[in-house]
Swiss-Prot record:
Domain ABC transporter: 6-244
Keywords: Antibiotic resistance, ATP-binding, Cell inner membrane, Cell membrane, Membrane, Nucleotide-binding, Translocase, Transmembrane, Transmembrane helix, Transport
The organism's place on the tree of life at top rank: Bacteria
Pfam families linked: ABC_tran, FtsX, MacB_PCD
Residues spanning the membrane: 273-293, 522-542, 577-597, 612-632
Lineage: Bacteria, Pseudomonadati, Pseudomonadota, Gammaproteobacteria, Alteromonadales
KW Kinase (keyword) present: no
Signal sequence segment: none
Assembly with partners or alone: Homodimer. Part of the tripartite efflux system MacAB-TolC, which is composed of an inner membrane transporter, MacB, a periplasmic membrane fusion protein, MacA, and an outer membrane component, TolC. The complex forms a large protein conduit and can translocate molecules across both the inner and outer membranes. Interacts with MacA.
Annotated membrane topology: Multi-pass membrane protein
Name of the protein described by the UniProt record: Macrolide export ATP-binding/permease protein MacB
GO CC entries: plasma membrane
Length: 647
């Protein structure tokens, strides 16, 4: 003989009310066979709703046992009970409990989503059920666009979506007018005729008369159990053993959770935007700071490169600001010649400079006249705008050939080409053979005018001195600059007998600037990250509020079969989505800041790196997961009975 469909034995249900315990059900024993139509009648507070919650696996007895087709529910966990509700029970609530953001067909589909049904299959079935119940022209209407009777029919269709072997109707006519109530009871009788087990919970004896069996409960005790007809013979169609598996279309769960998250966000647009604001500001700050740091670093390094790549400058004296450096005359051309023979040296250019008056026609300007070697322009990264540079022969012959910069050209030759023209440096006539492209110094734009001559010409024909103002050494690319610098210092100390000079290693400067910029970027980014954390706390706060506001929705979802993991997933996806949208808007804001920065005359461009953008998205996701987990977990742990009772 097969077991009864539903069997409660020795059931007690006790609740804690302050310091006292309130026993709502007392030693309830009840058996319901498959195919019965049962009415449980009782006054308010009699325990009938608590009994229905236990029958529908929304609650568990405090003491006693509840068997479904012979399976003891006391050993089942929350997800196993959810599967029973999902696949074998259908609920019809007095207040309908439809999800306000979903259409009629969307509400009916919800149980099938959690059952893992394919999208097309569940849509077809939902449409079929609604059409069968006379709502074929209301498929896309939301609950607030439907009458009370129509909303109740939607809840009936939802109860039938996954089969609804057992239909639990809680005061099904309580919120309906008499005509709609009559139609609802006739509909329940039709479902009973189709083989569904119907359990009606009501306080109205007139409603109970539609059932074949009336159970009266008072003060938690069943006081009568009357059958109007014989119990139907139960068919051997056992309830599926609980294995907590997903049947098909598991990916649809994520898609539906994503859709519900979008719906929740669009319903509260302003609140969602304000929640995102902390994330937007934090992400925009981090990305902008990194872009500013990268842009400024690249600008500075480009300026340093203008001093020469992999170069070491040698100057007389004991360091910058040394007043005695002008009296040090030991740096000579032979030092430069000696440095050329070092194996790690690529090229050497001596430097002599002097401030002098330059004349052309009736125009006179004060310029810095630089005596340099032919390698100077390559070492310093100068490029020709017109003309040519001189060569070794010019140095050997003390050639009176000059290269001028663009500022000199603009001063003396604003409308004509200077190539081939003769100018006077002091009293020495020189011919202009080249003009360099405009170039900024490492410290920004310079107003000084520059003319370059062979160092032999400046030393021998103009200033008449046999010592140098400096030497620039270009190293081979494969040589560590610090080691080469020490070798140069050692050689010159041996030649001079004293270290009466100092060196400027451009690579060392570059490395120091890179370290400093990285440190500053990290420091400012750390400050910006604080706003991200504040934004994350804001997300958590709003999500906690959202869970409180949507408690009844969570209860409905649990009643139709949502597992704890389904609820957790939905709220977690919502939190992550809020943060990802905030991250996207933050990155867009960072780019907008870059455009404004460029338009307002910034001295360099903000450079956005793919790494920082990817990191921003990763950070947004992480914040969503970290700060969204607590609200999502709270939602998943709600008791379905308490959640449904919450207004």
């Amino acid at each position: 003989m097969s077991a009864a469909l539903l069997e409660i034995s020795g059931c007690y249900r006790t609740f804690q009310a302050g310091e006292q315990q309130l026993t709502v059900l007392k030693d309830v024993n009840l058996t319901i066979e498959r195919g019965e139509m049962v009415a449980i009648v009782g006054a308010s507070g009699s325990g009938k709703s608590t009994l229905m919650n236990i029958l529908g696996c929304l609650d568990k007895p405090s003491k006693g046992a509840y068997f479904i087709n012979g399976q003891d529910t006391s050993t089942m966990d929350a997800d196993e009970l959810a599967q029973l509700r999902r696949e074998h029970f259908g609920f019809i609530f007095q207040r309908y409990h439809l999800l306000s953001d979903l259409t009629a067909i969307g509400n009916v589909e919800v149980p099938a989503v959690y059952a893992g049904k394919e999208r097309s299959a569940r849509k077809d079935r939902a449409e079929h059920l609604l059409t069968r119940l006379g709502l074929g022209d209301r498929l896309d209407h939301k609950p607030n666009q439907l009458s009370g009777g129509q909303q109740q029919r939607v809840s009936v269709a939802r109860a039938l979506m996954n089969g609804g072997d057992v239909i639990l109707a809680d005061e099904p006519t309580g919120a309906l007018d008499s005509h709609s109530g009559e139609e609802m009871m006739q509909l329940l009788q039709e479902l009973h005729s189709d083989g569904h087990t119907i359990i009606i919970v009501t306080h109205d004896m007139n409603v109970a008369q539609y059932a074949d069996r009336i159970i009266e409960i008072k003060d938690g005790i069943i006081i009568s159990d009357e059958r109007k007809t014989k119990a139907p013979k139960h068919v051997d169609t056992a309830v599926t053993k609980i294995n907590n598996r997903i049947r098909v279309a598991s990916w649809d769960r994520y898609v539906e959770a994503f859709k519900m998250a979008l719906l929740a966000m669009s319903t509260h647009r302003l609140r969602t935007f304000l929640t995102m604001l902390g994330i937007i500001i934090g992400i925009a700050s981090v990305v902008s700071v990194v872009a500013l740091g990268e842009g400024s670093q690249r600008e500075i390094l480009n300026s340093i490169s203008s001093m020469g790549t992999n170069t070491i400058d040698i100057r007389p004296g004991f360091g910058f600001g040394d007043r005695r450096s002008g009296k040090v005359k030991t740096l000579i051309v032979k030092d430069a010649d000696a440095l050329k023979h070092l194996p790690y040296v690529d090229s050497v250019t001596p430097t002599v400079d002097s401030s002098m008056t330059l004349r052309y026609g009736n125009k006179a300007v004060t310029t810095v006249v630089n005596g340099v070697g032919p390698e100077f322009f390559r070492v310093r990264g100068y490029e020709l705008a017109m003309g040519q540079f001189w060569d070794e022969d010019s140095v050997s012959s003390l050639a009176q050939d000059a290269v001028i910069d663009d500022k000199v050209r603009k001063e003396l030759f604003p409308r004509s080409s200077p190539i081939g023209e003769v100018i006077f440096i002091g009293n020495l006539p020189v011919r202009i053979i080249g003009v360099t492209e405009p170039k900024d110094s490492v410290f920004g734009k310079s107003d000084s005018l520059n003319v370059w001559l062979p160092y032999t010409t400046l030393s021998g024909r103009i200033v008449g001195k046999n010592y140098l103002n400096g030497i620039t050494v270009r190293l081979n690319e494969s040589v560590p600059s610090n080691a080469a610098e020490q070798g140069i210092i050692t050689l010159l100390k041996m030649r001079h007998g004293i270290e009466d000079f100092f060196t400027i290693n451009t690579d060392a400067i570059r490395q120091n600037i890179e370290k400093t910029t990285a440190t500053m970027t990290l420091l400012i980014s750390a400050i910006a990250v604080i706003s991200l954390i504040v934004g994350g706390i804001g997300v958590m706060n709003i999500m906690l509020v959202s869970v409180t506001e949507r408690t009844r929705e969570i209860g409905v979802r649990m009643a139709v079969g949502a597992r704890q993991s389904d609820i957790l997933r939905q709220f977690l996806i919502e939190a992550v989505l809020v943060c990802l949208c905030g991250g996207t808007l933050g990155i867009a804001l960072a780019y907008l800041i870059g455009v404004v920065f460029a338009q307002t005359g910034g001295s360099f461009q903000m450079i956005y790196s793919t790494t920082s953008i990817v990191a921003a998205f990763a950070c947004s996701t992480l914040i969503g997961v970290l700060f969204g987990f607590l609200p999502a977990r709270n939602a998943a742990r709600l008791d379905p009975v308490d959640a449904l009772a919450r207004e």
